[in-house]
Amino acid sequence: MASKVNSDRCWRGVLRGVDMVSRNRVVRTEDYSNYCGMHDSYLAFLPDDLRPDPGLRPESTWWRWRGGRIHIERVPRSDAAVRMLLVHGGGGHAAMMWPFAALAARQGFEVLVPDLPGYGRSEVESAGAVRYSDWVDCVADLVRAEKAADPRPLVVFGASMGGMLAYEAAARTGMVEAIAVTCLLDPRSPLARRRIGRFRWLGRFGAPLLVPVVDGVRVPMRLVANMTAMSNLPGLTATVIADPRGGGVGFLRTYLCSVPLVEPENFTACPVWLLHPGADRWTPLAVSRMFFDRIAAPKHLLVLDRASHYPVEDPGIRQLTTALADIHHWVAGG
């Protein structure tokens, strides 16, 4: 009970601040200590020499979208030639992406990481009413807004379910220079559904058993997704499972029924880098390759050795870091 009270106090503290509106962004003045240590909890699993300088902290900003406010963490760099938008997956949030955002900043990117609707600190009228299509629209709209505000080249990095969101954003906007993803899960595939879900029946029968009448029920992701396979590091898996984020059943149902706007055979929006963990027990490489191998655009595959679904293990995390540097160099025209 005490931890619940402390958590509530922490979030109330986070939501205090002064709004400063610039274009369609609302910037809040907040102290990093209000983040309740979530960022550092995830950073702790990076190899020591890859952890950022303690002085590197994200800035909290807010973007008005569909009557709500999307929380976006940023590492501004006015001298950066390339910007990177990082997109989390189901059950994730910006703080969970901080280790990868910090590595991207270290490779020269200006970085932004949104909390997608219903997760993290973003504010929506009803989290239980959020559908997968809202996430697709949100990421695409954010790409458009960011490109309108800043013409620098933009790369979208998608982790887990965020991989398909990055793909959709590039296909829908035509404004992305490249996408980098850790996996590409097409939920139309029974094999993909079996790997996504905690229960085998999800792969066999899929969305029809998740009837709309229960769409508004909110459940922790750990109860429906195979989150015990998040990492091969027990401590990291425990951290993720304990993270109190939950999504509506309607979100899962609409995700399982989703169809990409552009089939991979017709996707030519930008090059695609698949940076796939080599020891991913949740979504093995074969699942992603069913979609990736069909993509018409120039594409690159890198298997991250000994890395799990949340890829922080050596040597995979170093390979990912090098790949980010290579992508930056390529997009910047070096």
Please place each PLM-identified region on the residue numbering.
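Short beta-strand/loop motif that positions the catalytic acidic residue
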Residues: 268, 274-276, 280
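An N-terminal hydrophobic leader/cap segment in hydrolases
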Residues: 8-64, 68-75
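Short alpha-helix in the alpha/beta-hydrolase fold that links the catalytic acid
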Residues: 270, 284-293
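Active-site glycine-rich loops that stabilize anionic/oxyanionic intermediates
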Residues: 89-92, 278
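Alpha/beta-hydrolase-fold enzymes
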Residues: 159-245
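Catalytic active-site module of serine/aspartate enzymes centered on a nucleophile-bearing elbow/loop
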Residues: 298-334
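Catalytic nucleophile-loop/oxyanion-hole region of alpha/beta-hydrolase
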Residues: 91-96, 120-151
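Conserved alpha/beta-hydrolase
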Residues: 94, 101-125
